[in-house]
Design a protein with these regions (language model features):
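C-terminal accessory extensions appended to soluble enzyme cores
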Residues: 78-83, 89-143
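Conserved AdoMet/S-adenosylmethionine-binding subsite of the radical SAM
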Residues: 1-100
Length: 143
């Protein structure tokens, strides 16, 4: 069993992760689990494209690894936002004013995702940022 924690920048969490624990509360929980000897995965997924996303995600990575002992981490996952066309249709009906559901995504095999140029830019940026703290062989991508 691997205990996984999804972590987002504070701005993204405040806007889109209603009723979820704050990002730094998740980091504290991850720390406690690691201190208890449990394998922990940090998930920087789904990455949300927003104003100053580079700054938001860069600060988040620095904040996370100022508190987490990377040598105790099992691994790290990275992935940009993607969603099934059926679920996005439901979300658009339920939350018509949300910027996330109104983005002009590409539909690839029934799943909406950011256009390739945005997606690859975000994911490559995060791999680079996280690899300053974690060996690349412990970083994997969700596709």
């Amino acid at each position: 069993v691997i205990i996984a924690y999804t972590v987002s920048p504070q701005r993204v969490a405040a806007e889109y992760e209603h009723f979820a624990s704050a990002p730094m509360e998740r980091i504290q929980a991850a720390k406690c689990a690691m201190d208890g000897g449990f394998p922990v995965r940090l998930c920087f997924d789904p990455m949300i494209y927003c104003k100053d996303w580079r700054g938001e995600y860069s600060r988040m990575v620095d904040d996370v690894f100022s508190q987490i002992d990377d040598s105790k981490l099992w691994d790290v996952s990275i992935g940009s936002f993607r969603i099934s066309q059926d679920y996005l249709k439901k979300m658009r009906k339920d939350m018509p004013r949300s910027a996330v559901v109104n983005f002009p995504y590409d539909n690839v095999n029934g799943y909406y995702q950011y256009p390739e140029n945005i997606r690859s830019d975000m994911e490559e940026f995060m791999i680079q940022a996280v690899s300053e703290y974690v060996d690349k062989d412990r970083i994997f991508m969700w596709k």
